[in-house]
Amino acid sequence: LLHLRWQKVIVGALLLGQAILFSANAQTSSYYRKHLEHYDDKPVHYGFLFALPVTRFGIVHSNTFLTQDTLNRITAPATAGFRMGFVVNGYLNDSWDIRTTPSVSLYDRRVQYEYAKGSTRNELREATWIEIPVLFKYKSQRRMNTRMYMLGGMTFGFETNVRKRLRQGSDFLNTRGSDLTVDYGFGLEQFLAYTKFSPEIRFSHGILNLFRSNDLNTASNGIRRLTSHTVTIYLMFE
């Protein structure tokens, strides 16, 4: 699982590095036009985004799991989702911006139970979430048409299909319908002729316990705490 998660992160880092190399090579030419030269004079900018989140549950086992002898492992493999939304960026000063990226995310989080007799059971949590982050962005100095940045903040999210999930059956894995995460990441701003393109990698770690006990689901009795962990590759246009 750890190998799979880091493989996704490495792929994203390589894509971002490739964009940086492309920008650096372009600036070595003898003539280079500075696009959107007065971009920072406008206090607020709007845009849209597409993103690929790779997400999983972080599991803390309960005392029941430690004392029983029928269940060997409970794991949460990383799975890919999809996200799209809007960008609202407010200028604070030459170094700092405040940003929000309200978005709709489609997640397929999975919990896998491995039993002592060799059998396995998978529970898939398909969910649609609306997520609203508040982020502070620290910007480097602009070098012609390129600028690096780091950002951090928090995101509040809530699930929109809770009733549908509850109708699926009372013996399913039960989780909370809201979450709060700590977010941080880095990205590259590339100023083009008519827009600004920003690839970004962002890490999110949930601080709320999403698990709700369910006596009808005996396998989940081995879980005490579930938290969300997500690595997301963003493509933003402003």
PLM regions: where:
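Short glycine/proline- and aromatic-enriched beta-strand/turn motifs that initiate or cap beta-hairpins
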Residues: N25-A78, E238
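Outer-membrane beta-barrel channels and translocator barrels
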Residues: D41, N93, Q141-N145, F191-A193, ...
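Residues that define the transmembrane beta-barrel architecture of outer-membrane proteins
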Residues: K42-V44, A78-F82, E126-I130, T146, ...
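Repeated loop/turn-to-beta-strand initiation elements of outer-membrane beta-barrel proteins
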Residues: R56, S95-I98, M144, Y194-F197
